């Protein structure tokens, strides 16, 4: 629209291309703008509950379940949702516990969803998060708050362009290169690790980091 008027949504918009079009009122609400210097932890707050979205992706069923709550749901910059005016919330496809290992794992859509990907990523990321030897509170403790694991289908590293504690980079032979304290384009510390061995490799790195 070259000459769209500054009318609010719900009123008439004019342009040099289209005839006058009337847009419905979608019920947008003007809210107070706040600046956050760091990511807010998941959990219960005075005004509602903050839940995480694994890999930043919601399916239709989860969206419908959220809509059925009939609550004000807001999207945050941190792959999470803030549900207002609710005291507790649990959903199998969302993260409600700040200590859940899934909070610290990122993964691209991987194979077959992306033509550039060499490997499947999401199932591996979930397997790492559910590995008993890497859960919080157990020997070999999975990951302190600053630890992040990134599973990348290729060297592009789309899901996490910055450095992570461990970055697993999928190769054409469907094995992985392992980068420690770096991003997907950095020099690996391990090369050509098979899918079957990759969780053991991650566990070994984390155990040495935690002095186990």
Label for each model-derived stretch:
Residues 50-177, 203:
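Small-residue-enriched alpha-helical segments and adjacent helix-cap loops
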């Amino acid at each position: 629209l070259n000459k769209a008027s500054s009318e609010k949504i719900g009123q008439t918009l004019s342009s040099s291309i289209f005839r006058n079009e009337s847009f419905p009122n979608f019920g947008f609400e003007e809210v107070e703008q706040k600046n956050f210097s760091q990511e807010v932890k998941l959990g219960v707050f005075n005004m509602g509950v903050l839940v995480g979205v694994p890999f930043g992706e919601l399916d239709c069923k989860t969206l419908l379940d959220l809509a059925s709550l009939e609550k004000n749901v807001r999207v945050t910059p941190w792959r999470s949702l803030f549900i207002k005016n609710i005291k507790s919330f649990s959903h199998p496809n969302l993260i409600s516990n700040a200590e859940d290992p899934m909070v610290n794992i990122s993964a691209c859509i991987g194979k077959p969803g992306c033509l550039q990907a060499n490997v499947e990523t999401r199932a591996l990321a979930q397997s790492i998060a559910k590995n008993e030897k890497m859960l919080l509170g157990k020997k070999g403790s999975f990951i302190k708050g600053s630890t992040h694991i990134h599973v990348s289908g290729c060297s592009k590293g789309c899901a996490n362009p910055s450095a992570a504690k461990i970055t697993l980079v999928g190769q054409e032979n469907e094995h992985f290169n392992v980068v420690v304290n770096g991003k997907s384009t950095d020099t690996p510390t391990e090369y050509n690790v098979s899918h079957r061995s990759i969780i053991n490799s991650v566990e070994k790195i984390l155990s040495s980091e935690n002095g186990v």
